[in-house]
Amino acid sequence: MRVTVLGAGAFGTALSVALYNSCCSVALWSRNKRVLEELRNTGMNSLYLPGCLVPKEIELIPDVESALKCASVLLLCVPTQELRNLCNDVRNTAALDASVPVLVCSKGIENKSLKFAGEVIEELLPDNPVFVLSGPALAKEMVRGLPCAMVLAGRDESLAASLAEKLSSAVMSIAPSTDYVGVQIGSVLKNIIAIACGIVIGKGLGYNASAMVVVRGIAEIQAVSTAKSESVDLSTIIGLACLGDLVLTCTSASSRNMSFGLAIGKGQDIASRNDSLVEGAESAQSIDRLSNTLGIHLPVCSAIAKLLRGELDTDQVINQLLFA
């Protein structure tokens, strides 16, 4: 199986290595030519995944059209706000066969359209089967060959099962799911909830308070799932894509979202933070707007959105996170 990964950030690079170790033939593309040059010369990606060696057998490709040729599976590993431009590039090359499954690994919501990542891809690549790959998988651990498990969700149950089996390995377990909407909702909201947990811990309020935020956050995932799809798959809520990823993101110092919240809770000025790689910061505003459109109240997500807009201070946010 030839797998093409578009995006050589931390997760795209780590996933490329994990899939290569699963005996896949892997091609990796990046818009950042310096990243590709360093990978080609040293096998390292010091910008996004320092200290980790990438096998020289992974093919490094500088242009999208060449990367798409002969691909049997396409994985998109770029920030959500860059997905539309990338999908337009893919579509304009006309090099992607309509039978090739497209797997999105972005955990966000498009700010302008309020569409989840999979919805953006379905709009721009309507002929290709689209799946969402999500779950508790830190790039730094994946690239070292440590065990992880994820969910592959899509509308085609049999194809999801087939892909999950082919992409899995002895250390990377991928389970198929048909809860295409619920998995995406969980993957987006968990980042916002992680920021909230980081703030609580940073303020010195302890893990009891953090657990309160997690429980409230799960209720908000359920509320959005119900409003978007009129049903809730309990196995998704308590499974890898929601609870599993939520626990990892809310407890790991390696989580950018948790670290972002932690710094805010400790008093660091939000304006001084570079949040370009913090998906939860991007998603908070969009989810706040989406909740208004859906007519639902999400106290945790709303509090983080208002904080980032400068409408609440951290003490007011704590009150809303724990007691509103």
From Swiss-Prot:
Main location: cytoplasm
Places the protein is found: Cytoplasm
Gene Ontology molecular function, alphabetical: glycerol-3-phosphate dehydrogenase [NAD(P)+] activity; NAD binding
Cross-referenced InterPro entries: 6-PGluconate_DH-like_C_sf (IPR008927), 6PGD_dom2 (IPR013328), G3P_DH_NAD-dep (IPR006168), G3P_DH_NAD-dep_C (IPR006109), G3P_DH_NAD-dep_N (IPR011128), NAD(P)-bd_dom_sf (IPR036291)
Annotated catalysed reactions: sn-glycerol 3-phosphate + NAD(+) = dihydroxyacetone phosphate + NADH + H(+); sn-glycerol 3-phosphate + NADP(+) = dihydroxyacetone phosphate + NADPH + H(+)
A Pfam family: NAD_Gly3P_dh_C
SUPFAM superfamilies: 6-phosphogluconate dehydrogenase C-terminal domain-like (SSF48179), NAD(P)-binding Rossmann-fold domains (SSF51735)
Binding positions for sn-glycerol 3-phosphate per the UniProt entry: K107, G135, K190, D245, S255, R256, N257
GO biological process, one term: phospholipid biosynthetic process
Pathways per UniProt: Membrane lipid metabolism; glycerophospholipid metabolism
Top enzyme class: oxidoreductase
EC number per UniProt: 1.1.1.94
Record-listed NADPH binding positions: F11, R31, K107, A139, R256, V278, E279
Catalytic center residues: K190 (proton acceptor)
GO annotations of cellular component type: cytosol
Keyword tags: Cytoplasm, Lipid biosynthesis, Lipid metabolism, NAD, NADP, Nucleotide-binding, Oxidoreductase, Phospholipid biosynthesis, Phospholipid metabolism
Function noted in UniProt: Catalyzes the reduction of the glycolytic intermediate dihydroxyacetone phosphate (DHAP) to sn-glycerol 3-phosphate (G3P), the key precursor for phospholipid synthesis.
Similarity-based family: Belongs to the NAD-dependent glycerol-3-phosphate dehydrogenase family.
Protein name listed in UniProt: Glycerol-3-phosphate dehydrogenase [NAD(P)+]
Organism: Anaplasma phagocytophilum (strain HZ)
Gene encoding the protein: gpsA
